[in-house]
């Protein structure tokens, strides 16, 4: 899975928040699930402007169908008309069709200028089926009528501004990714345009069946791990597998352990600030539980989503360099294993700027997580954890691509120290993890760094069930923007919180994790980078359960201090951020 660093840094560097009084409005990132990405669209009937009756299934022979909401009166729609005309002409040969939908009842669309099918949706049927909210909004359907992208065409035009050319081509990038068999890096944005009131037409509801609804929920939220070759203990890619595991699915979803996401939910009426939020939407959760409690209808196989292809090669493309641990590590069948630490030399005689990185275990099924540190040549890497990691791997998240102008520095002569946590699964095996790097073509404008807010001097008393430890960086001497947060503790970790303190003493919570789970070393990646003014402070607080109420506690009778193994503890609040690079062009 590719992390969306490119999208987050470039596509939304100039957006405004919902609370911003600035009247200018550019596309903003949305959570795909909340935007309806991954949902099945029923086979809605329509009559086009030429008087020809049709259905959405008329486009099933197309690889992709763009459903573009537009009209002839909205200024933004007028500006985007040439782009849509080019789109339907240039992408037709690639198997992409375009359906134009005009939701404005009083509009006179006769001179619209498009060659594709054009529907004047006066009764709001199509508008209701898609839930369109703007005249400039586009939807991309695959051949199974699954929404794969929803949002803006690009960011050239918005409310109160116009650019000479787009900075980010959201729609074209999504189409390119989808035709290449990839999930779009950005699959949902807002679409500034002329606002649409909710359609008075009642949307045609798809029957609650496995093929029409549940299969997509599982595919979108569980498929990355619960598939053949995935890290999960069982697959969920067929009806029979889902039915066979229905009790476990219900239990883990009800408890909030699946899908794995442990940030506190946003306040009512607010949206999650994290681009990789894995929380099930309320509608997905409701439908999943309703189906599990019913006779679990399978439905029509014609309504099934397309099978998802998972890449077997490098997600970052061909690396410029690969580094692999020298010898395979034997992973036993039972019990637990301590962290394995292995260093690999790089031997570069100059600093390297890394624009993309990917960590690839050869036995993913037993790898809990990997942290890679860049340490001085020949060093044992003592204390490296507190300095910040270079790259990371957790199941479902193993690669990171930065956009042009952003990169991490790999100091000359560094060793790459792999810290690998294995979880035996009943079968003995071996692993020989490696990392691939893609180098920037020139010194970047911005350097991406990782640091840790830490307090290594803590002592957790025996039996303490809610021991609090606080670490801080009281004064940050430069301006920065935070990309992601990554709390790290071991099996006694209970909860965590990040706060930013401004010069005037105001404290803002950046992330709260009320139930930390060592089994999932998650990064929390912001949809929009968080500005950190010079002079601000960062506070990281962690709570620990060293009592017998913690079933993962190896020994409640022991006082616990900092240490590298899971029976020790750590207190690390990793922060990924970027700053201007000295001497960059």
Kindly label every feature range from the protein language model.
Residues 44-65, 203-212:
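A short beta-strand-turn-helix
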Residues 188-348, 360, 413-419, 424-426:
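Aromatic- and Gly/Pro-enriched helix-to-coil junctions and flexible linker segments
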Residues 59-78, 175:
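Short active-site neighborhood of thiol/selenol oxidoreductases, capturing the structured segment around
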Residues 133, 313-585:
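His-enriched metal-coordination microenvironments in redox/metal-binding proteins
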Residues 78-113, 119-129:
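Structural microenvironment flanking redox-active thiols in thiol-disulfide oxidoreductases
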Residues 19-43, 185-187, 191-204:
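N-proximal helix/coil linker or "cap" segments that precede and/or mark the start of modular domains
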Residues 68-74, 103, 218-220, 227:
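Aromatic-flanked redox-active Cys/Sec active sites in thiol-based oxidoreductases
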Residues 121-197:
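Thiol/selenol-based redox catalytic cores and closely related redox-interacting motifs
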């Amino acid at each position: 899975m590719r992390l969306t660093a490119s999208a987050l840094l470039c596509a939304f560097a100039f957006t405004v928040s919902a609370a911003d009084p600035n009247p200018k409005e550019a596309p903003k990132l949305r959570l795909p699930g909340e935007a309806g990405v991954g949902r099945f669209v029923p086979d809605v009937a329509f009559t086009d402007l030429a008087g020809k009756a049709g259905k959405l299934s008329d486009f099933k022979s197309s690889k992709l169908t763009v459903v573009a909401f537009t009209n002839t009166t909205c200024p933004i729609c007028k500006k985007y008309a040439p782009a849509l005309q080019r789109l339907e002409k240039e992408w037709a040969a690639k198997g992409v069709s375009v359906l134009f939908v005009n939701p404005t009842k009083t509009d006179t669309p006769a001179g619209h200028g498009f060659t594709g099918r054009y529907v004047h949706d006066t009764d709001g049927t199509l508008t209701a089926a898609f839930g369109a909210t703007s005249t400039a909004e586009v939807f991309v359907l695959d051949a199974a009528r699954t929404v794969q992208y929803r949002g803006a065409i690009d960011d050239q035009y918005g409310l109160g501004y116009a650019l000479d050319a787009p900075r980010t081509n959201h729609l074209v990038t999504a189409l390119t990714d989808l035709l290449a068999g990839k999930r779009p890096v950005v699959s949902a944005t807002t679409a500034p345009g002329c606002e649409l009131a909710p359609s008075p037409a009642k949307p045609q509801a798809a029957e609650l069946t496995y093929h029409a609804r549940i299969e997509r929920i599982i595919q979108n939220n569980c498929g990355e791990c619960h598939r053949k070759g995935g890290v999960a203990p069982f697959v969920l890619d067929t009806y029979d597998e889902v039915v066979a595991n229905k009790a476990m699915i219900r239990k883990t979803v009800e408890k909030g352990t699946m899908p794995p996401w442990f940030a506190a939910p946003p306040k009512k009426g607010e949206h999650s600030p994290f681009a990789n939020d894995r929380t099930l939407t309320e509608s997905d959760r409701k439908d999943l539980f309703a189906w599990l409690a019913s006779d679990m209808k399978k439905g029509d196989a014609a309504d099934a989503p397309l099978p998802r292809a998972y890449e077997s090669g490098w997600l970052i493309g061909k690396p410029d360099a690969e580094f692999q641990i020298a010898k395979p590590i034997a992973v036993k069948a039972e019990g637990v294993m301590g962290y394995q630490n292995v260093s690999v030399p790089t031997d570069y005689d100059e600093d390297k700027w890394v624009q993309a990185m990917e960590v690839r275990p050869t036995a993913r099924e037993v790898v809990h997580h990997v942290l890679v540190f860049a340490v001085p040549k020949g060093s044992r890497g003592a204390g490296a954890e507190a300095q910040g990691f270079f790259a990371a791997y957790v199941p479902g998240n193993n690669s990171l691509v930065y956009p042009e102008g952003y990169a991490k520095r790999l100091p000359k002569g560094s060793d790459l120290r792999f810290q690998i946590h294995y979880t035996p699964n009943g079968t003995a095996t071996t692993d020989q993890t490696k990392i691939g790097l893609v180098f920037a073509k020139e010194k970047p404008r911005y350097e991406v760094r990782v640091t840790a807010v830490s307090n290594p001097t803590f002592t957790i008393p025996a039996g303490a069930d809610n021991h609090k430890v606080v670490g801080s960086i009281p004064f940050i001497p430069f301006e920065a923007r935070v990309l992601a947060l990554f709390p790290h503790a071991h099996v006694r970790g209970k909860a965590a919180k990040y706060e930013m303190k401004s010069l005037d003493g105001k404290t803002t919570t950046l992330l709260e994790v009320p139930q930390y789970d060592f089994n999932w070393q998650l990064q929390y990646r912001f949809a929009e980078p968080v500005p950190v003014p010079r002079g601000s402070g960062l506070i990281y607080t962690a709570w620990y359960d060293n009592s017998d109420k913690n079933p993962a506690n190896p020994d409640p009778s022991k006082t616990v201090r900092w240490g590298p193994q899971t029976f020790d503890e750590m207190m690390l609040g990793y922060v990924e951020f970027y700053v201007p690079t000295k001497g960059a062009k």
